[in-house]
A protein has these predicted regions:
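A composition-driven surface/loop motif
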Residues: 1-120
Length: 120
């Protein structure tokens, strides 16, 4: 698993309501979210750090940011593509995933992504 995958999945999951999942499902879901959150929080911090590190020394408000953006994107993408210890995301039964989808009225692409990532 790369960091980008963990960040993207947490970004989808962080606002979802759990609904009436089974005890096993809710426990696994919460523990997985906590592991993903560690990577997401690291991402939030590293974005700021990389932005500061790549900011041109003579930059003034209103200056063209194209070069800065290019350098920043290269650095953040390098970080996002780093491998991490795999986080088991295939933790939910069909019933628990359906409960999660119903409780949150999720659109089709989110349902597809969650099915791909969360079903045992």
């Amino acid at each position: 698993m790369i960091k980008k995958q963990a960040v993207e999945l947490y970004a989808i999951l962080r606002e979802l309501k759990n609904g009436s999942m089974s005890k096993e499902g809710i426990t696994a879901f919460i523990l997985m979210r906590l592991k993903l959150k560690v990577v997401f929080d690291e991402f939030e911090t590293i974005k700021i750090d990389i932005s500061k590190e790549t900011k041109p020394e003579d930059f003034k408000e209103g200056d063209d940011v194209t070069e800065w953006n290019t350098i920043f994107q290269s650095a953040i993408n390098e970080w996002l593509n780093e491998e991490i210890e795999t986080i088991d995301t295939h933790i939910l039964s069909n019933e628990d995933l359906i409960e999660l989808v119903n409780k949150n009225d999720l659109v089709g692409w989110m349902q597809d992504k969650l099915f791909e990532k969360l079903i045992k």
